[in-house]
Amino acid sequence: MRTNPLVLGVSALVEKNVGRIAQIIGPVLDVSFPPGNMPNIYNSLIVKGQGTAGQEIQVTCEVQQLLGNHKVRAVAMSATDGLTRGMRVIDTGAPLSVPVGGATLGRIFNVLGEPVDNLGPVDARITSPIHRSAPAFTELDTKLSIFETGIKVVDLLAPYRRGGKIGLFGGAGVGKTVLIMELINNIAKAHGGVSVFGGVGERTREGNDLYMEMKESGVIDEQNISESKVALVYGQMNEPPGARMRVGLTALTMAEYFRDVNEQDVLSFIDNIFRFVQAGSEVSALLGRMPSAVGYQPTLATEMGSLQERITSTKRGSITSIQAVYVPADDLTDPAPATTFAHLDATTVPSRGLAAKGIYPAVDPLDSTSTMLQPWIVGEEHYETAQGVKQTLQRYKELQDIIAIPGLDELSEEDRLIVARARKIERFLSQPFFVAEVFTGFPGKYVGLMETIRGFQMILSGELEQSFYLVGNIDEATAKAMNSKTES
């Protein structure tokens, strides 16, 4: 950790090593330095000067290649408009560093760690470089443990691993944002943890909408900003590829501080991991590298691995990462999603069909998967209950065509029983969220894992349809059923 001249301002830099711009090709700069004073790979360079219209220019770049003849090739982290050949370039002598710690909570940052929310400067006394090695094997926590979210459908059928990576698939309008906000809320309340959201190459409008919804739901506390539960880092799709390629590392660096120094459980969101790969592909082409399969960068697996391997549990704390995964043209064999899948421990798949029925969270119980759902990890009771729920829902899915045309009367007695239980399960998988109280009118519920297992065991064994809709644990469903009987 050290003082960060990029955040304090260029005036704080000691101009030990100064070069000049030799060539500009879009967001790529070639810079000449004096012999014997070449900057290292990943060093941060700052271009200062005046543009053609007399405006002050300050562009931060990152060294990517040493070309020979005392030249380096760097990629800009912001627009290169107004830069000219011959401009002075200062070598900071270190990689890009960003603010970390409690001061980042409730704030929005860009890739450089600069606040962009108009709420004033951030306490930048503690900073950390964005390029770091993954934790050593001896530091890792090798124990397999479930990361309890308090969301029934997730904890029972596709449990998250503490320090694992989860892929979040799905289109617009199925409740991904609300699910993300509920996870942020629950980790703060149940685990005393914090969250870091990395907006990588997505729409600016989506970033703004998320910020507004977080303020409305209390995840970000405007009145007492230090009580907020999340830090936001945005590198949106209108920014140069260098910024989109590095913004994920900026967010991860902030998360690592909470894990390693504050010894907390951290939830890290990356939306969207495909845009990280896409930005790397653009930078690779700009640097003149030979493309690999489908035009992707030859270093795709290396870049993905260097990001993903930093997301893990250590003996101090954990980073559990939820990554939105865009699948281009729905082709799962595309190198970008295929490389991502190799790192995932679980997948959460929102369902448009469930959302249309008004069942929220609209997580598909059959398509969502987890490597943690093994009897030797979660225990026999949890495993058997989850398998029973899946078998019932799968049989119900197979019977849908018969129900739609001839009707329920054509089913056998056993199948009718399965349909009745599956409908109860489907309703019981719904749950009121704390962050959605404002628009559902139902108080939010956090349901512990043991309560979840007990509830589904009771349904599978043939006990208590409407009683299961938007309730927390099984006792509430029982009370609701008793009230209905009394009223009738």
Curated annotation (Swiss-Prot):
Primary location: plastid
Gene Ontology molecular functions: ATP binding; ATP hydrolysis activity; proton-transporting ATP synthase activity, rotational mechanism
InterPro entries: AAA+_ATPase, ATP-synt_VA_C, ATP_synth_F1_bsu, ATPase_a/bsu_AS, ATPase_alpha/beta_chains, ATPase_F1/V1/A1_a/bsu_N, ATPase_F1/V1/A1_a/bsu_N_sf, ATPase_F1/V1/A1_a/bsu_nucl-bd
CDD domains cross-referenced by the UniProt entry: ATP-synt_F1_beta_C, ATP-synt_F1_beta_N, F1-ATPase_beta_CD
A GO cellular component annotation in the UniProt record: mitochondrion
BP GO terms, sorted: proton motive force-driven mitochondrial ATP synthesis
Cell compartment(s), UniProt: Plastid, Chloroplast thylakoid membrane
EC number: 7.1.2.2
Annotated residues for binding of ATP: G170, G171, A172, G173, V174, G175, K176, T177
Membrane topology, as annotated: Peripheral membrane protein
SUPFAM superfamilies according to UniProt: C-terminal domain of alpha and beta subunits of F1 ATP synthase, N-terminal domain of alpha and beta subunits of F1 ATP synthase, P-loop containing nucleoside triphosphate hydrolases
Reactions the enzyme catalyzes: ATP + H2O + 4 H(+)(in) = ADP + phosphate + 5 H(+)(out)
Keyword entries, A-Z: ATP synthesis, ATP-binding, CF(1), Chloroplast, Hydrogen ion transport, Ion transport, Membrane, Nucleotide-binding, Plastid, Thylakoid, Translocase, Transport
Similarity comment text for this entry: Belongs to the ATPase alpha/beta chains family.
Classification via HAMAP family: ATP_synth_beta_bact (MF_01347)
Subunit structure: F-type ATPases have 2 components, CF(1) - the catalytic core - and CF(0) - the membrane proton channel. CF(1) has five subunits: alpha(3), beta(3), gamma(1), delta(1), epsilon(1). CF(0) has four main subunits: a(1), b(1), b'(1) and c(9-12).
Annotated PANTHER family: ATP SYNTHASE, ATP SYNTHASE SUBUNIT BETA, MITOCHONDRIAL
Function: Produces ATP from ADP in the presence of a proton gradient across the membrane. The catalytic sites are hosted primarily by the beta subunits.
Protein name per UniProt: ATP synthase subunit beta, chloroplastic
Organism in which the protein naturally occurs: Picea abies
Lineage, uppermost ranks: Eukaryota, Viridiplantae, Streptophyta, Embryophyta, Tracheophyta
